[in-house]
């Protein structure tokens, strides 16, 4: 039996329902309405997901979480939207809690000798409530899985675990929380660059000193992870995806992905699986939860999420001191760079036979790290630019190369990969312009496309 405890939330979800098609005897039924539902969140959600695999000892707050007061447990709110045969989160609406101080969290937890204890530390008070901690972490020797959120590496619980259980502690955190903590880790350039940045931060950033002698799993979006185990570092990655890709492509947002990762990871750990398999299962479960969303009830689709690990997820050992030249493709014995290059040129890219990181920008495909980082940098600029509804200036990019090198093709494919529905391609051959009026006419075409609500990459 696994014990799960930690910060508990009550997660309210609401979704709209159409009014009656026929005129109802009650006026309110003729108008758009909303339904609401309270779900167990935080540690209770992690426990519920783990029950899909094994027996779980967890806190109890009663049968009706919606009847709890915000002074007792933090309440969160999210508005859903229909997507397919279920729902995704349209908007996270915020939280409510006690007017001052910490929530009281009046839950009960049965004492049980568990080989594994999972602590969901969301930074909402549990870390300071020693009276709520399971007695095993005070005097026993269990394996402890700590799912920690910002603010990181603070509080009585963290200090206690570092002092009493460093050898039996596995910490699960996110790259975004590390960035918020001050770690300069680039986002969405290449898997190699992310890994190199992480290694540098672990070696040089004093705020991460506590992690250097621990076993740490850093979740990189929903697409990858890094396992840092007392200096031995492994990177887990989806070869065709980069950090944030799944979130960008999903029909909406989703909550509970961190709990899904932790539950799948811990379940595999309890089965005696190797760390690689545990992490792969965690990545797979979190990604599937985002893809599936809430079920039609709506509720968490637990039976649809926890399956075998995605066999496309690659794993590679990160060198101790990478210096900007390291590539996954050059990591023996996984890859022979010459054979891999020859295979791609002759046969094209095959996920099964060649699990290299590959970037897809529309019809443009590249497996070269430098090209990936260059294209991703430009694409990131485009994404940020298109988030601005009323930019004052155009985004200007200079592309150089001989005729026929694919300059226009590369730019158009990059733009199309950002938001194909809003992109309207406009190509102008300046060498054919006869006078200044031709240039003015080109600018007018760009203006007209903008007035239509489109984003026109004007290639001159």
Give residue ranges: language-model regions:
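Short helix/loop segment immediately N-terminal to the Walker
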Residues: 382-395, 454-456
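Hydrophobic positions in the central parallel beta-sheet of the AAA+
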Residues: 117, 426-428, 458-460
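AAA+/P-loop NTPase substrate/partner-engagement loops
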Residues: 70-73, 83-85, 400-405, 416-453
């Amino acid at each position: 039996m696994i014990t799960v405890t930690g910060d508990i939330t009550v997660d309210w979800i609401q979704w709209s329902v159409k009014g009656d098609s026929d005129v109802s005897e009650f006026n309110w039924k003729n108008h758009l309405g909303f339904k609401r539902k309270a779900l167990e969140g935080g540690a209770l959600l992690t426990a519920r997901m783990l029950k899909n695999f094994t027996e779980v000892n967890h806190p109890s707050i009663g049968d009706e979480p919606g009847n709890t007061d915000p002074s007792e447990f933090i309440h969160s709110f999210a508005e859903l939207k229909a997507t397919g045969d279920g729902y995704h989160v349209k908007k996270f609406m915020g939280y409510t809690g006690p007017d001052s101080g910490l929530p009281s969290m009046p839950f009960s937890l049965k004492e049980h000798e568990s080989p594994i204890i999972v602590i969901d530390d969301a930074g909402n008070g549990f870390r300071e409530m020693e009276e709520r901690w399971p007695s095993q972490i005070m005097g026993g020797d269990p394996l402890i899985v700590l799912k920690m959120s910002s603010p990181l590496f603070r509080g009585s619980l963290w200090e206690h675990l570092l002092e009493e259980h460093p050898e039996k502690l596995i910490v699960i955190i996110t790259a975004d929380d590390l960035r918020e903590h001050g770690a300069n880790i680039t986002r969405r350039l290449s898997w190699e660059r992310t890994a190199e940045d992480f290694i540098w931060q672990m070696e040089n950033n004093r705020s991460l000193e506590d992690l250097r002698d621990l076993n740490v799993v850093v979740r990189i979006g929903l697409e990858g992870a890094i396992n840092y185990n007392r200096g031995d570092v492994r990177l887990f990655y989806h070869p065709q995806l980069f950090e944030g890709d799944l979130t960008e492509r999903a029909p909406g947002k989703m909550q509970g992905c961190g709990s899904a990762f932790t539950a799948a990871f811990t379940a595999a750990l309890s089965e005696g699986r190797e760390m690689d398999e545990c992490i792969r299962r965690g990545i797979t479960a979190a990604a599937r939860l985002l893809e599936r969303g809430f079920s039609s009830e709506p509720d968490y689709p637990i039976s649809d999420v926890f399956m075998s690990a995605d066999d496309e997820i690659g794993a590679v050992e990160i060198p101790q001191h990478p210096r900007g030249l390291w590539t996954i493709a050059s990591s023996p014995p996984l890859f022979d760079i010459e054979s891999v290059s020859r295979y791609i040129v002759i046969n094209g890219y095959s996920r099964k036979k060649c699990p290299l990181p590959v970037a897809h920008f529309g019809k443009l495909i590249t497996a070269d790290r430098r090209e990936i980082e260059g294209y991703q940098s430009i694409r990131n600029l485009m994404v940020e630019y298109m988030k601005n509804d009323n930019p004052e200036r155009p985004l200007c990019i200079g592309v150089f190369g001989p005729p026929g090198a694919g300059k226009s093709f590369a730019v158009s494919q990059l733009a199309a990969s950002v938001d194909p529905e809003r992109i309207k391609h406009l190509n102008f051959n300046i060498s054919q312009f006869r006078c200044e009026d031709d240039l003015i006419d080109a600018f007018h075409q760009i203006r007209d496309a903008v007035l239509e609500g489109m984003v026109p990459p004007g290639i001159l």
